[in-house]
UniProtKB/Swiss-Prot annotation:
Binding site for Fe cation 1: 97, 127, 130
EC number: 1.17.4.1
Catalytic activity of the protein: a 2'-deoxyribonucleoside 5'-diphosphate + [thioredoxin]-disulfide + H2O = a ribonucleoside 5'-diphosphate + [thioredoxin]-dithiol
CDD domains to which the protein is assigned, alphabetical: Hint, RNRR2
Protein's name in the database: Ribonucleoside-diphosphate reductase subunit beta
PANTHER family xref list: RIBONUCLEOSIDE-DIPHOSPHATE REDUCTASE SMALL CHAIN, RIBONUCLEOSIDE-DIPHOSPHATE REDUCTASE SUBUNIT M2
Cofactor notes: Binds 2 iron ions per subunit.
Catalytic residues as annotated in Swiss-Prot or TrEMBL: 134
PTM section of the record: This protein undergoes a protein self splicing that involves a post-translational excision of the intervening region (intein) followed by peptide ligation.
GO biological process, one term: intein-mediated protein splicing
Length: 696
């Protein structure tokens, strides 16, 4: 890759009086900041959200986990081989996260947008907490003299010294020459470090924990070794096409993201997609009265609203409180905005822009009203399609004077569009033939999704649409709680799905039921639309934990929150938090393929092979084939399996095609934090042993 001054990354000044104050002029790098944090305006909201997530949500204190029992077991239960491995692994893990802290610090010195620098600082702090956690484990379990020896192992153990150099050299080269090529290489190095280089050590700790040994050490590792948090198979996400199953998402799909600060919905392209195998605990929140439910992996965050204050926050699904003043939002307010970004441009300074589409509509047109009536009470005459006359004929019949008067009012409003019509009196009502010009841009159809574009409408348009809809194909019942509620019914699943999507964008809760007639081809879908409610109360909900084995899915968006639907139940939920550097790599490969030259792609594959071999040798060296439950063969196959998994997750072919199964499947379940219940008011983890904790 050509090295030019344009590709060099420059460190910012500590204080720059001539810098730009305006948020619109901020750049991730190569900007001109004063370097004074002025956060009254935020340009990169995704970074500020990430800062708050890492700084305040995903946090624990190592001292909260008592290590006394582990100290006793280290002295009396562990074999000499287990002690040696325990010490070597901790020494190595301390080094790895020490490198991470400095690597992020070097990045931060060149970042020129304050909110982005804060996010990097938060991640740097998390890595320092990891390093401190390893140190806390070490000094809690072994005596001070021995702990000092373990810190110094890298000077005495040549294998450990070489291990420390592997990733460190990539980071050092980036520091020496901070250009695009070295950025990609450092990114790959970071990805390998986080997703591969910890794992033989983690496998050793989990093997001990599986035998009931050093369980508090293992609990610390579980907090560090968190995985993606996802939705169960069958969950859908709201896109510009409507609700789409995660399995059917296209690369060009824009999804609805929710701003927790404003309650507004905008469209954006996901910057990460997750599809993976999962085996372990799932949680279901269910509202029996309305048949509303949602299912997600343990730890997946949902938006929770305090009904007294109106404030919203994120809580893991297993910790959502079920009481009268707690609610889960199920809809937002779409204002016509699209959040656009290019991840490489984020790094090079162009950032995220929020644009309002000029084509958005605030009011229904007469033609749109006519199409709503067509869906409810009309038919399209397929034989009189206007091939020779230029007019498609539509047929209507009404017996109620209310509908007759309203329909003729709409027809008169449609006259400027070239609509013509005739009416015929019948014994039981009035029939109409409407002549619909073929040259109108909107074609007559019985399906809403063929003429409504979700990105071209606003909340005002949606509410007017719903008002018009229930005039023709529904009614306004009297709710016992005196809430404003509409009722709509249809036999068309497409229309049911689309109305739910509209209501989710228009700030309205929906409840769906199905009534199947044995004599009818299709069931009748009944939708109750609560115009004044955009949430569902948790008071009468039921929370269930159950075992699940199968696929899970999710996406990641800049705002961190998405609109999902499961079994016709809509809600706002947090998206998954996935490996940052994996997302950077994947997005760069799509948006900036020129950076991934054949030479760079060859280097990535070869470096992955090298890293896998180094991790295998390290794991075998540490365990010496003397640890019950894990041996050299298992380590080799496990690390090769992870190597295949990690490299395919960034778009490359498996490097070990002969390895297709995870030989240590039990780790994926064992490492979940589902046997630790944390009381956040007391901030003290309480661990409850489960019967399956020692299963083999």
């Amino acid at each position: 890759m050509e090295k030019t001054e344009k590709n060099e990354l420059v460190r910012k000044l500590i204080f720059n009086p001539q810098g730009d104050r305006e948020a619109s002029k901020r750049k991730i790098i190569k900007g001109n900041p004063t370097n004074i944090f002025e956060l009254n305006e935020i340009k990169y909201s995704w970074a500020f959200d990430l800062y708050k997530l890492m700084g305040f949500t995903n946090f624990w204190i190592p001292e909260e986990i008592q290590m006394l029992e582990d100290r006793k077991q280290y002295e009396t239960v562990l074999s000499d081989y287990e002690k040696r491995a325990y010490e070597l692994v901790l020494s190595f893990l301390i080094a790895l996260d020490s490198f991470q802290v400095d690597m992020l610090k070097e990045f931060g010195r060149m970042i020129t947008a304050p909110e982005v620098e804060m996010a990097i600082t938060a991640q740097e702090f998390q890595e320092s907490v990891h390093a401190y956690s390893y140190q806390f484990i070490l000094e809690s379990v072994v005596d001070p003299v021995k702990a000092d020896e373990i810190y110094n192992y890298w000077r005495e153990d040549e294998r450990l010294l070489e291990r420390n150099k592997v990733i460190a050299e990539l980071y050092n080269e980036f520091i020496r020459k901070p250009n695009e090529e070295n950025f990609i290489k450092a990114t790959i190095g970071n990805y390998i470090l986080e997703s591969l280089y910890f794992y033989s050590g983690f496998a050793f700790f989990y093997t001990l924990g599986r035998q009931g040994k050093m369980r508090n050490t293992v609990q610390q590792i579980k907090y560090i070794n968190r995985d993606e948090l996802c939705f169960i198979e069958g969950t859908e996400v709201l896109t510009k096409r409507g609700f789409v199953d995660f399995r059917e998402l296209r690369e060009d799909d824009l999804v609805a993201q929710y701003d927790i600060e404003t309650g507004e919905i905008s469209w954006t392209k996901p910057y990460a997609y997750v599809e993976r195998d999962y085996e372990g605990s799932m949680y279901r929140l269910k509202h029996p009265k309305s048949n509303w439910e949602v299912v997600a992996t343990e730890g997946h965050e949902f938006i929770v609203r305090n009904l007294k204050t109106g404030k919203e926050r994120k809580e893991p699904i297993e910790k959502v409180k079920l009481h009268p003043y707690s609610a889960i939002p199920v809809a937002g307010r779409y204002t016509g905005e699209v959040e656009e970004y290019d991840l490489w441009e984020l790094v090079s300074g162009k950032g995220i822009t929020l644009k309002t589409r000029s084509a958005v509509k605030n009011k229904l047109t007469p033609i749109e009203k006519l199409l709503i009536v067509l869906q409810a009470d009309g038919t399209i005459d397929s034989k009189r399609n206007g091939k020779f006359t230029g007019f498609q004929q539509l047929k209507f019949f009404f017996s109620k004077y209310r509908k007759i008067n309203e329909f003729e009012k709409i027809l008169n409003e449609c006259a400027p569009y070239g609509i013509k019509w005739k009416k015929y009196e019948r014994q039981d009502g009035i029939a109409y033939t409407v002549y619909y010009p073929n040259d109108l841009p909107i074609k007559p159809t019985k399906f809403f999704d063929e003429w409504v574009r979700l990105d071209e409408i606003t909340e005002e348009w949606i509410r007017e649409f719903v008002e018009e809809l229930v005039k023709w194909d529904g009614h306004i019942p009297k709710d016992r709680n005196k809430k404003k509620v509409y009722y709509y019914s249809t036999k068309e699943k497409r229309n049911k799905d689309f109305v739910q999507a509209l209501c989710a964008l228009g700030g309205m809760r929906t409840v769906v039921s199905r009534e199947r007639n044995p004599k009818a081809k299709n069931p009748v879908y009944r939708i109750w639309i609560y115009l004044e409610d955009d949430y569902i109360n948790t008071q009468t909900m039921v929370k269930e934990e159950f075992y699940y084995k199968g696929k899970v899915y999710c996406v990641s968006v800049p705002k961190g929150n998405i609109v999902v639907r499961y079994k016709d139940s809509v809600c706002i939920a947090g998206n998954c938090h996935v490996t940052l550097f994996r997302n950077i790599i994947n997005t760069l490969r799509k948006e900036n393929p020129e950076l991934f030259t054949p030479e760079i792609e060859k280097w990535i594959v070869e470096y992955f092979k090298y890293a896998v071999n180094e991790e295998i040798k390290w794991g075998q060296y540490v365990t010496q084939n003397q640890i019950l439950g894990i041996n050299d063969v298992l380590i080799e196959r496990y690390i090769k399996y992870l190597g295949n998994l990690r490299i395919t997750q960034i778009g490359f072919d498996p490097i070990y095609p002969e390895v297709t199964e995870n030989p240590l499947k039990w780790i994926d379940e064992f490492r979940k934090i589902n046997n630790t219940k944390t009381d956040f008011f007391q901030a003290k983890p309480q661990t409850y042993s489960k019967a399956n904790e020692l299963k083999w």
